[in-house]
Every structure is written in C-alpha cells, then in structure tokens.
C-alpha cells in the first residue's frame, strides 16, 4: 500500500576537494581539523543509512591524509554505517588514501586515480632546450 509517511532512505554526503594540508580561513584545502566535525555530523545522522564521500584531490600531506582516513574508518565502525566513495577528477596520493576508507569506491573511467606517496623529481634545462629546439610531448596511459 502506498503511503506518504514511508520513511525515505537518506544518505549523508561529505565533499572533500583540494590539496590536503594545512587549510585555513583564507587557504582552501582539506585538513583534519577542518573536516573532523563534518565527518562526525555525517556519521551521527540517525536517518542516514550510509555516508557518501566525494573526493577530488591530488593529495598533499601524508599525516593529514592518514588522520582523515583513520577518523572515517573509526566513525564508520562506531556507527555501523557503510562508506561509499566517489572519485571525481583526481584521487591521487593522499586523496587515494582517503578514498581507501570507503567500503566501496567508484570512479569515472576518465578520473585520475593515483598511488600513495609518489614524488617525481627532475632537472630543468629550459634554456638549453629552447636553444636546441627540443619539443615537449606528453603520453599518458591508464
């Protein structure tokens, strides 16, 4: 029988976007201090059957990433709620670590999903490159 009074399923949603590190009033980004209350509130919603997290981050601080990851897992365990993560454009390095806090992870086939703790270092020869006419080409796969 149809009823207007049936309880609708609710999903709590957290959006994490930006570089992971010391964020502040005038500095955008993701850090544990700025997300702690938001995460707590999402998991404490009694009507919510699960928590969805949308992440769009190239990574950043490994410490902040790990603090957020651990806190999400702790809150999920305490509340007995599943965590579903949706990677938007990028979930790399620390963003990927936070994504791993999910019980399920979904990503677009065009999303950049990266590994944890990758650092690339190189030398720059910009003047020499200009002088001898070297052209830059980028190839990606995956």
Regions of interest found by a model, annotated:
Residues 1-81, 90-97, 101-142:
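Small-residue-centered hinge/linker elements
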């Amino acid at each position: 029988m149809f009823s207007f009074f049936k309880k609708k399923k609710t999903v709590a949603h957290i959006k994490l976007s930006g570089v992971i590190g010391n964020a502040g009033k005038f500095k955008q980004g993701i850090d544990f201090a700025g997300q702690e209350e938001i995460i707590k509130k999402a998991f404490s919603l009694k009507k919510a059957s699960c928590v969805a997290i949308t992440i769009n981050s190239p990574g950043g601080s490994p410490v902040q990433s790990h603090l957020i990851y651990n806190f999400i897992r702790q809150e999920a365990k305490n509340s007995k709620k599943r965590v579903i993560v949706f990677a938007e454009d990028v979930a790399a390095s620390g963003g990927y670590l936070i994504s791993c806090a999910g019980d399920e992870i979904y990503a677009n086939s065009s999303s950049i999903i990266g590994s944890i703790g990758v650092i690339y270092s190189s030398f720059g020869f910009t003047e020499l490159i200009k002088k001898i006419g070297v052209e830059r080409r980028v190839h990606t796969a995956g």
